[in-house]
Amino acid sequence: MTAQDFVVKDIGLAAYGRKELDIAETEMPGLMACRKEFSSSQPLRGARISGSLHMTIQTAVLIETLKAIGADIRWSSSNIFSTQDHAAAAIAATGIPVFAVKGETLEEYWTYIDAIFQWPDGHPSNMILDDGADATNYILVGSRAEQNKDILSHPKTEEEEIFFKQIQKRMDATPGFFTRQRAAIKGVSEETTTGVNRLYQLQKEGLLPFPAINVNDSVTKSKFDNKYGCKESLVDGIRRGTDVMIAGKTAIVCGYGDVGKGSAASLSGAGARVKVTEIDPICALQAAMDGYEVVNLDDAASSADIIITTTGNKDVVRLDHMRQVKDMCILGNIGHFDNEIQVAALRNLPWTNIKPQVDMITFPDGKRIILLSEGRLLNLGNATGHPSFVMSASFTNQVLAQIELFTRAEHYTNEVTVLPKNLDEKVARLHLDRLGIKLTVLSEEQAAYIGVTPQGPYKPNHYRY
């Protein structure tokens, strides 16, 4: 790495970041077990990983785990507000190129995505570790643009315009770059629901040119990170952002998937009166039987003190909803992208910045709303994201997925798959001792009776936890 081969806010924060890293390691037993298991065999030797995932302290432990088992790495954040600057500095100080600053512009964000594919020796990456599929999309859209430049001519949003400009800039600087880079990729492991949905859409359209592992739908990711992580980090973000008393307030959670379930529990645990919106009758019934009132936002927006989106969809909270809410209603999103709330429709109104990632927007009638993190992930923009322990489970899945794709690429086709059940159970097993959990062990007779082995796997792939 050259002296300039990183972009962080302040490299002087590295010592502070290292102290927090040391604490996080004690809460991330899965990643530490991976270092112990694979340090000798070095299964990722030769892997050149372009990583795009929130540059937090927990991610720093993931990065150093990948490095410890052989990988070369270049890293950027997957959200303009989610970087913890001391974490980025700690990683950069070790010689790993990282390009991440809290509060990036969109131009900087896409410049940094490009940078994770620009190795000093000029050779391409051969692996992607992604969160939201932006890094994957950058290479795939770029390779299509090298065949047909017209696809860059009609951006639909401001961010897409900036995205297309960065692709064009790289095409001009390095002709053929995207096509060569796409051909070199062995596989991608994807962290989040939104990114997985994008990959499945690419597969459906026949546009996925390499294997992908859906880390999000590992049970030890979606049923833990998405649920229990949000349960702790949502109210943390709201409180840090607003200092508002949550108890007694009416909160509406849009969506009751795993993230919605954790978010509703988070707000309920803080004393809020929680309502839920849903499109899916199964999830709606679950919410009702968990004790929440299931409503339509068109009818219920006027009752809300807090509205949180969790869906991964667009236009969930529209301008007409925001016109109905109470004065000083808090709006926030804990889904991946910023289009769940129609933030663009608010841009022509007066904005008052209260503090970083907290804005007050005033409507013509004088009513005000508080918007957290400009509609992006509030738990990472206004707070520090999920706790280390739950992220250890998610990131252990990422390590195992990278090893699978890099060492066993010939066993995978250009489709989206999930990790095998035995590896999912392994991830859980690695986290039991830290909580003092003692498993019951099946006898041979008991195992035979239910059709499993005493060592597992214990559930069929179709089992819903």
Swiss-Prot record:
Any one GO molecular-function label of the UniProt entry: adenosylhomocysteinase activity
Entry GO terms, CC: cytosol
Annotated metabolic or biological route of this protein: Amino-acid biosynthesis; L-homocysteine biosynthesis; L-homocysteine from S-adenosyl-L-homocysteine: step 1/1
Broad class of enzyme this protein falls into: hydrolase
Subcellular locations according to the entry: Cytoplasm
EC number, as in UniProt: 3.13.2.1
A Pfam family it matches: AdoHcyase
Keyword Ligase tagged: no
PROSITE patterns in alphabetical order: ADOHCYASE_1 (PS00738), ADOHCYASE_2 (PS00739)
InterPro entries found in the cross-reference section: Adenosylhomocyst_ase-like_sf, Adenosylhomocysteinase-like, Ado_hCys_hydrolase_NAD-bd, NAD(P)-bd_dom_sf, S-Ado-L-homoCys_hydrolase_CS
Cofactor: NAD(+)
Biological process annotations from GO: L-homocysteine biosynthetic process; one-carbon metabolic process; S-adenosylmethionine cycle
Catalytic reaction equation(s): S-adenosyl-L-homocysteine + H2O = L-homocysteine + adenosine
Cofactor note: Binds 1 NAD(+) per subunit.
Binding site for substrate: 56, 131, 191, 221, 225
Residues reported to bind NAD(+): 192-194, 226, 255-260, 278, 313, 334-336, 379
The keyword Thylakoid appears for this protein: no
Family (UniProt): Belongs to the adenosylhomocysteinase family.
UniProt xrefs under NCBIfam families: ahcY, PRK05476.2-3
Name this polypeptide is given: Adenosylhomocysteinase
Native source organism of the sequence: Bartonella tribocorum (strain CIP 105476 / IBS 506)
